[in-house]
Amino acid sequence: MMLVFQIALLVLVLYSLLLVVAVPVLYSSASDWSRAKNVILVGSLLWVLMVIGVGVLSFLK
């Protein structure tokens, strides 16, 4: 179970780093704002679910 938690935490950290780069780039691109808005929304929701999942795994370990 500890390995699953560590992998989930690593994925969360890497995804967070990806969002740190991707979100400002998407905000700065003026073209196709509706698509960028949807990508940011889905990416943020996925991040929240990952944080909750890591929290649950942390509680279970």
From Swiss-Prot:
It comes from the Bacteria. SUPFAM superfamilies: PsbZ-like. InterPro entries: PSII_PsbZ, PSII_PsbZ_sf. The chain crosses the membrane at residues 8-28, 41-61. GO terms for cellular component: photosystem II reaction center; plasma membrane-derived thylakoid membrane. GO terms for biological process: photosynthesis; photosystem II stabilization. It is a multi-pass membrane protein. It is found in: Cellular thylakoid membrane. Keywords: Membrane, Photosynthesis, Photosystem II, Reaction center, Thylakoid, Transmembrane, Transmembrane helix. Belongs to the PsbZ family. May control the interaction of photosystem II (PSII) cores with the light-harvesting antenna, regulates electron flow through the 2 photosystem reaction centers. PSII is a light-driven water plastoquinone oxidoreductase, using light energy to abstract electrons from H(2)O, generating a proton gradient subsequently used for ATP formation. PANTHER family: PHOTOSYSTEM II REACTION CENTER PROTEIN Z (PTHR34971:SF2). PSII is composed of 1 copy each of membrane proteins PsbA, PsbB, PsbC, PsbD, PsbE, PsbF, PsbH, PsbI, PsbJ, PsbK, PsbL, PsbM, PsbT, PsbX, PsbY, PsbZ, Psb30/Ycf12, peripheral proteins PsbO, CyanoQ (PsbQ), PsbU, PsbV and a large number of cofactors. It forms dimeric complexes. This is Photosystem II reaction center protein Z. It comes from Synechococcus sp. (strain JA-2-3B'a(2-13)).
